[in-house]
């Protein structure tokens, strides 16, 4: 936002990430008259800070349900690369009960729906909401987080406009073919989704559902 001379506000549960953001914002260009704020608070409270129909764009990469809340085994990496600095570590950002990264997919989807229901009235009509997310494997099952998010946001009044695939080939080049040679399993870590929604141009009720 600073590079584009746009006003922006960001939220995070962890003070250390807010502090990091503020330190980077302190390095912005001298003649940049736009303002960017970093606030330490829950996403569920964002509507307390902003007025209705004042937001032109929401961009976020929420936790991928409880994907990171387990020890990393690095099964997709070759040989010695498996036991890197991440091996057997739990990389979940926090264990706070407010953190979406501690939730199983069903509870996660319900919380996401409620958060975005509160955000919808803040958007201008036709304003965009872009969510970066990936799917995951959990107990040998493919969890389609991007499908859950699409359904959740549609239920509270958003309209899906596009799905963009973010190719992460640079990471794929460093890993093997998972399961080779006994079997082949496609790897979800090779790409992520950019889910492009907007607030529909027709009126939206106060609870976030379209009035049509």
How does the language model describe each region?
Residues 1-212:
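Class I S-adenosyl-L-methionine-dependent methyltransferase catalytic core
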């Amino acid at each position: 936002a600073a590079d584009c001379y746009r006003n922006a506000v960001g939220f995070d549960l962890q003070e250390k990430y807010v502090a990091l953001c503020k330190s980077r914002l302190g390095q912005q260009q001298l003649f940049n008259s736009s303002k960017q704020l970093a606030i330490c608070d829950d996403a569920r409270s964002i509507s307390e800070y902003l007025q209705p129909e004042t937001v032109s764009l929401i961009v976020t990469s929420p936790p991928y349900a409880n994907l990171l809340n387990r020890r990393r085994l690095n099964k997709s990496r070759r040989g010695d690369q498996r036991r890197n600095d991440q091996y057997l570590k739990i990389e979940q950002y926090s264990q706070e009960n407010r953190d979406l990264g501690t939730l199983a997919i069903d509870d996660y989807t319900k919380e996401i729906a409620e958060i975005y229901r509160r955000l919808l009235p803040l958007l201008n009509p036709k304003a965009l909401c872009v969510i970066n997310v990936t799917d995951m494997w959990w107990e040998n099952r493919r969890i389609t987080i991007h499908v859950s998010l699409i359904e959740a946001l549609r239920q509270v009044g958003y309209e899906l406009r596009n799905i963009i695939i973010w190719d992460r080939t640079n990471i794929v080049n460093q890993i093997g073919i998972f399961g080779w040679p006994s079997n082949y399993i496609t790897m979800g870590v090779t790409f992520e989704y950019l889910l492009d929604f907007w607030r529909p141009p027709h009126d939206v009720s106060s609870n976030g559902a379209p009035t049509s």
